[in-house]
């Protein structure tokens, strides 16, 4: 992937690691140094283009990786440059891997909920012309070493078939532990929780708790939709004009339909007993004059 500026000078190392600050790496001695703001603009251009290419490769309706999303999240991007081909002496980018810690509720093999904060594979892309040349493995290995994690300790955000094959081939990851969210975890995930699953800080104030295992890809569906099960259609006296969304089963992501009115209170409370609380639900209960504190406690 080529750019109209000198990628080779911008990223002196074969693999560059970027965090939310998008700081330009130190340049090689003797290279002219453009203004810092220009360098950061170049980095933002690279990230945006990589995000678009990755989305296209995965048939996503919109990129899940962009410079602005990097700046507003605590994700880490590993970017691999091509050190062999140097078109017009400006270098090229081979691909990237994006990771980040996320608080998730995952099921173990006894189907019990566990609150964990593992390192997650969020986005991964190698340029089409260079796939199956070992570049993906090189990036992945580098990330594992830097982050000090073992492959079975990772959670993967809705992996593609190619990524599942990749993980199987290079890391023998095959048997998954079925989940009800979009993350895939493999056998062995629960065997070693320290590290990488970060020790969680003391219980946060209720308002701070994030939605149920929110995937980075959620916003691709309906941006303002509340999470499952709050998005289920209310019971209706007359049949709906359209068939209801497919029901979910263990191991599959719940199918999300378009934004619907909230479920009736009793059904909502029943659903909430089955899953961790969500701020939207708390807001509903807090504004409901009939919702007693006892009812509210049941949602914890
Ligand atoms: C959470 C997420 O990010 S999900 C999205 C993952 N990204 C994508 O699907 C985008 C398109 N794919 C890619 O960019 C790349 O194929 C990656 C990132 C998945 C792997 O990078 P590569 O450089 O191709 O991997 P690398 O060369 O190190 O390993 C090759 C192995 O990956 C798997 N793989 C890679 N491409 C394919 C493919 N087209 N079909 C099937 N398996 C594939 C295979 O196991 C392959 O081994 P094989 O060639 O012996 O069958």
From Swiss-Prot:
Compartments, as annotated in UniProt: Cytoplasm; Membrane, Clathrin-coated pit; Cell junction, Focal adhesion; Cell projection, Axon
Binding annotation for acetyl-CoA: 124-137, 160-169
Molecular function, one GO term: L-lysine N-acetyltransferase activity, acting on acetyl phosphate as donor
Catalytic reactions of this protein: L-lysyl-[alpha-tubulin] + acetyl-CoA = N(6)-acetyl-L-lysyl-[alpha-tubulin] + CoA + H(+)
GO cellular component: axon; clathrin-coated pit; cytoplasm; focal adhesion; microtubule; spindle
Post-translational changes noted in the entry: Autoacetylation strongly increases tubulin acetylation.
Region Disordered, residue ranges: 229-263, 280-300
Keywords: Acetylation, Acyltransferase, Cell junction, Cell projection, Coated pit, Cytoplasm, Cytoskeleton, Membrane, Methylation, Phosphoprotein, Transferase
Statement: the UniProt record of this protein carries the keyword Cytoplasm: yes
List of residues that carry Phosphoserine: 249, 253, 292
Domain N-acetyltransferase: 1-190
Marked site (Crucial for catalytic activity) residue numbers: 58
Primary location: cytoplasm
Location of Omega-N-methylarginine modifications: 300
A Pfam match: Acetyltransf_16
InterPro entries reported for this sequence: Acyl_CoA_acyltransferase, Atat, GNAT_ATAT
Annotated Gene3D superfamilies: 3.40.630.30, 6.20.370.120
In-chain residues carrying the UniProt-annotated modification Asymmetric dimethylarginine: 282
Modified residues (N6-acetyllysine): 56, 146, 210, 221
EC code: 2.3.1.108
Hydrolase keyword on record: no
GO biological process: alpha-tubulin acetylation; microtubule cytoskeleton organization; neuron development; regulation of microtubule cytoskeleton organization
Entry's family note: Belongs to the acetyltransferase ATAT1 family.
Subunit structure comment from the entry: Component of the BBSome complex. Interacts with AP2 alpha-adaptins, including AP2A2, but not with AP1 gamma-adaptin (AP1G1/AP1G2); this interaction is required for efficient alpha-tubulin acetylation, hence clathrin-coated pits are sites of microtubule acetylation.
UniProt function note: Specifically acetylates 'Lys-40' in alpha-tubulin on the lumenal side of microtubules. Promotes microtubule destabilization and accelerates microtubule dynamics; this activity may be independent of acetylation activity. Acetylates alpha-tubulin with a slow enzymatic rate, due to a catalytic site that is not optimized for acetyl transfer. Enters the microtubule through each end and diffuses quickly throughout the lumen of microtubules.
Name of the protein: Alpha-tubulin N-acetyltransferase 1
Species per Swiss-Prot/TrEMBL record: Sus scrofa (Pig)
Upper taxonomic lineage: Eukaryota, Metazoa, Chordata, Craniata, Vertebrata
